Amino acid sequence: LFGHQTQDKLERFRSQGGAQSYPSRTKDVDDVDFSTGSVGLGVAMTLFSSIVQDYVRLKKLGDGAQPTGRMVALVGDAELDEGNIFEALLEGWKHDVRNLWWVIDYNRQSLDGVVNDRLFGRVAEMFELVGWRVVTLKYGRLLETAFAQPDGEQLRQWIDACPNSLYSALVFKGGAGWREALTRD
Protein backbone atom coordinates (compact mmCIF):
# COMPACT_ATOMS: atom_id res chain seq x y z
CA LEU A 1 0.00 0.00 0.00
CA PHE A 2 2.72 2.42 -1.06
CA GLY A 3 4.42 2.32 2.34
CA HIS A 4 1.45 3.77 4.22
CA GLN A 5 0.46 0.63 6.12
CA THR A 6 2.70 -1.95 7.75
CA GLN A 7 2.42 -5.65 7.03
CA ASP A 8 1.89 -6.25 10.76
CA LYS A 9 -1.13 -3.91 10.84
CA LEU A 10 -2.60 -5.56 7.73
CA GLU A 11 -2.11 -9.05 9.18
CA ARG A 12 -3.93 -7.93 12.33
CA PHE A 13 -6.77 -6.27 10.37
CA ARG A 14 -9.75 -5.49 12.66
CA SER A 15 -7.80 -6.76 15.69
CA GLN A 16 -6.24 -4.89 18.60
CA GLY A 17 -3.43 -2.77 17.16
CA GLY A 18 -4.27 -3.73 13.58
CA ALA A 19 -5.62 -1.70 10.70
CA GLN A 20 -9.17 -0.48 11.20
CA SER A 21 -12.07 -1.94 9.20
CA TYR A 22 -13.17 1.59 8.31
CA PRO A 23 -10.69 4.34 7.45
CA SER A 24 -10.16 6.63 10.41
CA ARG A 25 -8.00 9.73 10.67
CA THR A 26 -7.59 9.14 14.40
CA LYS A 27 -6.81 5.41 14.39
CA ASP A 28 -4.90 4.82 11.15
CA VAL A 29 -1.40 5.99 10.28
CA ASP A 30 -2.06 6.34 6.55
CA ASP A 31 -3.21 9.46 4.74
CA VAL A 32 -6.97 9.02 4.93
CA ASP A 33 -8.76 12.19 3.89
CA PHE A 34 -12.36 11.17 4.53
CA SER A 35 -13.30 8.77 7.26
CA THR A 36 -16.26 6.60 6.39
CA GLY A 37 -18.42 4.00 8.01
CA SER A 38 -21.52 1.99 7.38
CA VAL A 39 -23.49 5.07 6.34
CA GLY A 40 -21.51 5.63 3.14
CA LEU A 41 -20.76 9.31 3.75
CA GLY A 42 -17.06 9.04 2.92
CA VAL A 43 -17.87 7.27 -0.33
CA ALA A 44 -20.24 10.02 -1.48
CA MET A 45 -17.72 12.63 -0.32
CA THR A 46 -15.17 11.40 -2.88
CA LEU A 47 -17.66 11.92 -5.69
CA PHE A 48 -18.63 15.42 -4.59
CA SER A 49 -14.96 16.31 -4.02
CA SER A 50 -14.22 15.38 -7.61
CA ILE A 51 -17.07 17.60 -8.83
CA VAL A 52 -15.86 20.51 -6.68
CA GLN A 53 -12.29 20.02 -7.91
CA ASP A 54 -13.47 20.35 -11.53
CA TYR A 55 -15.58 23.40 -10.67
CA VAL A 56 -12.64 25.17 -9.00
CA ARG A 57 -10.40 24.38 -11.97
CA LEU A 58 -12.92 25.43 -14.64
CA LYS A 59 -13.82 28.69 -12.85
CA LYS A 60 -10.11 29.39 -12.22
CA LEU A 61 -10.77 29.85 -8.51
CA GLY A 62 -7.44 28.35 -7.44
CA ASP A 63 -3.90 29.32 -8.29
CA GLY A 64 -3.59 26.35 -10.69
CA ALA A 65 -0.53 25.02 -8.89
CA GLN A 66 -2.24 21.90 -7.58
CA PRO A 67 -2.26 18.83 -9.84
CA THR A 68 -5.63 17.22 -10.48
CA GLY A 69 -6.32 14.85 -7.62
CA ARG A 70 -7.71 11.36 -7.84
CA MET A 71 -10.56 10.41 -5.56
CA VAL A 72 -10.51 6.75 -4.52
CA ALA A 73 -12.95 5.07 -2.15
CA LEU A 74 -12.92 1.55 -0.77
CA VAL A 75 -16.54 0.53 -0.37
CA GLY A 76 -18.00 -2.47 1.40
CA ASP A 77 -20.95 -4.10 -0.34
CA ALA A 78 -23.13 -3.47 2.72
CA GLU A 79 -22.60 0.29 2.26
CA LEU A 80 -24.49 0.05 -1.02
CA ASP A 81 -27.68 -0.10 1.07
CA GLU A 82 -27.26 3.61 1.86
CA GLY A 83 -29.46 5.94 -0.16
CA ASN A 84 -26.98 8.81 -0.20
CA ILE A 85 -24.66 6.72 -2.38
CA PHE A 86 -27.29 6.51 -5.11
CA GLU A 87 -28.07 10.21 -4.80
CA ALA A 88 -24.35 10.85 -5.27
CA LEU A 89 -24.19 8.54 -8.30
CA LEU A 90 -27.02 10.45 -9.96
CA GLU A 91 -25.34 13.80 -9.25
CA GLY A 92 -22.10 12.43 -10.65
CA TRP A 93 -23.89 11.39 -13.84
CA LYS A 94 -25.51 14.82 -14.19
CA HIS A 95 -22.15 16.58 -13.81
CA ASP A 96 -19.97 14.08 -15.71
CA VAL A 97 -17.81 13.21 -12.70
CA ARG A 98 -14.16 12.39 -13.44
CA ASN A 99 -11.04 11.25 -11.60
CA LEU A 100 -13.04 8.96 -9.36
CA TRP A 101 -12.60 5.28 -8.55
CA TRP A 102 -14.70 3.22 -6.18
CA VAL A 103 -13.42 -0.23 -5.27
CA ILE A 104 -16.32 -2.33 -4.01
CA ASP A 105 -15.40 -5.23 -1.79
CA TYR A 106 -18.29 -7.60 -2.44
CA ASN A 107 -17.51 -9.99 0.40
CA ARG A 108 -21.16 -10.67 1.33
CA GLN A 109 -20.43 -9.60 4.91
CA SER A 110 -21.98 -6.85 6.99
CA LEU A 111 -21.69 -5.90 10.63
CA ASP A 112 -25.48 -5.49 10.56
CA GLY A 113 -26.38 -8.84 8.98
CA VAL A 114 -26.07 -10.74 5.73
CA VAL A 115 -26.02 -8.81 2.46
CA ASN A 116 -29.10 -9.44 0.31
CA ASP A 117 -28.51 -12.11 -2.37
CA ARG A 118 -30.17 -10.04 -5.07
CA LEU A 119 -27.71 -7.17 -4.70
CA PHE A 120 -24.80 -8.84 -6.50
CA GLY A 121 -26.67 -9.21 -9.77
CA ARG A 122 -27.47 -5.50 -9.81
CA VAL A 123 -24.31 -3.75 -8.63
CA ALA A 124 -22.57 -3.46 -12.01
CA GLU A 125 -25.86 -2.66 -13.71
CA MET A 126 -26.57 0.26 -11.34
CA PHE A 127 -23.17 1.82 -11.95
CA GLU A 128 -23.27 1.29 -15.72
CA LEU A 129 -26.69 2.95 -15.82
CA VAL A 130 -25.12 6.22 -14.67
CA GLY A 131 -22.16 6.01 -17.03
CA TRP A 132 -19.50 4.27 -14.97
CA ARG A 133 -17.00 1.88 -16.54
CA VAL A 134 -17.20 -1.24 -14.38
CA VAL A 135 -14.28 -3.64 -14.08
CA THR A 136 -15.07 -6.83 -12.18
CA LEU A 137 -12.28 -8.71 -10.44
CA LYS A 138 -14.21 -11.59 -8.99
CA TYR A 139 -11.86 -14.49 -8.40
CA GLY A 140 -8.28 -14.66 -7.17
CA ARG A 141 -5.43 -16.70 -8.60
CA LEU A 142 -6.07 -19.71 -6.38
CA LEU A 143 -9.71 -19.98 -7.43
CA GLU A 144 -8.85 -19.46 -11.10
CA THR A 145 -6.35 -22.32 -10.78
CA ALA A 146 -9.00 -24.49 -9.12
CA PHE A 147 -11.49 -23.67 -11.90
CA ALA A 148 -8.96 -24.93 -14.48
CA GLN A 149 -8.91 -28.37 -12.81
CA PRO A 150 -11.34 -31.20 -13.62
CA ASP A 151 -14.79 -30.26 -12.29
CA GLY A 152 -13.55 -26.69 -11.82
CA GLU A 153 -16.51 -25.26 -13.70
CA GLN A 154 -18.86 -27.00 -11.26
CA LEU A 155 -16.99 -25.31 -8.40
CA ARG A 156 -17.38 -21.91 -10.09
CA GLN A 157 -21.11 -22.48 -10.56
CA TRP A 158 -21.49 -23.61 -6.94
CA ILE A 159 -19.73 -20.49 -5.61
CA ASP A 160 -21.74 -18.20 -7.89
CA ALA A 161 -25.04 -19.80 -6.84
CA CYS A 162 -24.19 -20.01 -3.12
CA PRO A 163 -26.72 -17.94 -1.11
CA ASN A 164 -25.16 -15.20 1.01
CA SER A 165 -26.51 -16.70 4.21
CA LEU A 166 -24.69 -20.00 3.52
CA TYR A 167 -21.58 -18.20 2.26
CA SER A 168 -21.39 -16.16 5.48
CA ALA A 169 -21.84 -19.27 7.61
CA LEU A 170 -19.06 -21.07 5.73
CA VAL A 171 -16.70 -18.12 6.09
CA PHE A 172 -17.36 -18.26 9.83
CA LYS A 173 -16.81 -22.04 9.98
CA GLY A 174 -13.57 -21.92 8.00
CA GLY A 175 -11.95 -24.59 5.85
CA ALA A 176 -13.70 -27.56 7.48
CA GLY A 177 -17.10 -26.02 6.81
CA TRP A 178 -16.23 -25.35 3.17
CA ARG A 179 -14.94 -28.89 2.62
CA GLU A 180 -18.05 -30.39 4.18
CA ALA A 181 -20.43 -28.26 2.10
CA LEU A 182 -18.55 -28.77 -1.16
CA THR A 183 -18.24 -32.53 -0.62
CA ARG A 184 -21.93 -32.79 0.25
CA ASP A 185 -23.09 -30.77 -2.76
Model regions and ranges:
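Short glycine-/polar-rich loops that comprise or flank the Walker A/P-loop
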Residues: 69, 96-100, 131
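Cofactor-binding active-site loop characterized by glycine-rich and histidine/acidic residues
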Residues: 1-95
